[in-house]
Amino acid sequence: MSDLAQKFKDTVDYVQNADGDFEPSNELKLKMYALYKQATEGDVSGKKPGMMDFVGRAKYTAWEELKGMSADDAMQAYIDAIEELKS
């Protein structure tokens, strides 16, 4: 595993296990979701959720906007966003 991949994994673990009162905005949640999906799965795939599936459609659209971003760039952007929140 590369250093970047390990740091990404550590950052994801930190986010999933973080304690405290921090409640991220929906916008931040979507950004982090999209970066995670782009880093782990690549470009968006599958059918876009229907108009009445507001959450699913928002997630799909956020991920779709990252189309073409490399996994390494997505990992680094995810790490950078969390580091910025921690400071």
What are the residue ranges of the model-derived segments?
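A charge-rich, low-complexity, intrinsically flexible signal that marks solvent-exposed coils, linkers
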Residues: 3-87
